Design a protein with these regions (language model features):
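Conserved long alpha-helical elements within nucleotide-processing catalytic cores of c-di-GMP signaling
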Residues: 1-26, 33-60, 69-73, 77-78, ...
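Catalytic strand-loop-helix junctions within cyclic-nucleotide turnover domains
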Residues: 79-88, 106-109, 113-131, 155-161, ...
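Active-site core of bacterial EAL-family cyclic-dinucleotide phosphodiesterase domains
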Residues: 8, 12, 157, 164-204
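Structural alpha-helical segments in enzyme catalytic/regulatory domains
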Residues: 15-18, 96, 102-103, 167-174
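Short beta-strand edge/capping elements of PAS-family sensory modules
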Residues: 24, 149, 197-200
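A short pre-motif secondary-structure segment
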Residues: 66-71, 110
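Sensory input modules used in signal transduction
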Residues: 29, 116-118, 185, 203
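Catalytic/regulatory signature loops of cyclic-dinucleotide turnover enzymes
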Residues: 131-155, 171-182
Length: 204
């Protein structure tokens, strides 16, 4: 695609932050909602062409002092530099909307939608993977609530939800290691005969 691989992107971002600081930096995570539909409707060759075109569009943005890379097939991450999070959101949304409109006019059954999560990088942030986790969390929320291309900004609410999820997962691992889980079989009874016809397995 011409974009750097993720590891190279991380190296460049860490070097940039060390040299220039983190003020005005916003981490973005974008993917295409229901992209499998595009592949099924037009074929993988067209799908790959759309992703390649998006990568080229991102490369052009990279000339303005921002960084981007392709993480997986239709998942791209990068860093923007703007005065405020509102400006970063509005400019990036304008960019994705322009790309979507151009692509949808070319492939009229495409109905392309780009979901983006955005996280404002703070002075005490150094872990790029954590920045991406935060942007991903906002992106997932964007995909569940929006039917058009949109940019969801990571907030304190997302942080609390992410911490709660991590605590639950950590607690589940500890409970499994301590053999605290118990398996139960909940009977399924036929409404016609009143007899047990099966069971549902539950773990608590």
């Amino acid at each position: 695609t011409g974009l750097p691989i993720y590891n190279k992107f991380v190296d460049k971002l860490e070097a940039y932050m060390a040299a220039h600081g983190k003020s005005g930096l916003f981490f973005v995570s974008s993917d295409f909602s229901n992209f499998q539909y595009v592949n099924e409707m037009y074929g993988y060759e067209v799908g790959d062409r759309i992703l390649h075109d998006f990568a080229i569009a991102l490369q052009e943005k990279c000339q303005n002092g921002v960084l981007f890379c392709r993480v997986t097939s239709d998942h791209f991450v990068g860093v923007l530099k703007e005065d405020t999070v509102e400006k970063a959101r509005d400019k990036y949304l304008e960019f994705t909307n322009t790309f979507v409109q151009k692509t949808n006019s070319r492939y009229d059954q495409c109905n392309l939608v780009i979901a983006t999560g955005m996280y404002e990088i703070l002075e005490n942030d150094w872990s790029v993977s954590s920045m991406m986790d935060n942007a991903n969390e906002a992106r997932k929320q964007c995909k569940t609530q929006k039917v058009d291309s949109a940019v969801e900004i990571y907030t304190e609410k997302f942080r609390k939800n992410l911490e709660n999820t991590r605590e639950i997962v950590s607690g589940m691992v500890a409970a499994y290691n301590n053999k605290e889980f118990r398996a139960y079989l909940q009977p399924k009874v036929s409404l016609h005969t009143g007899k047990v016809v099966g069971a549902e397995a539950l773990v608590r």
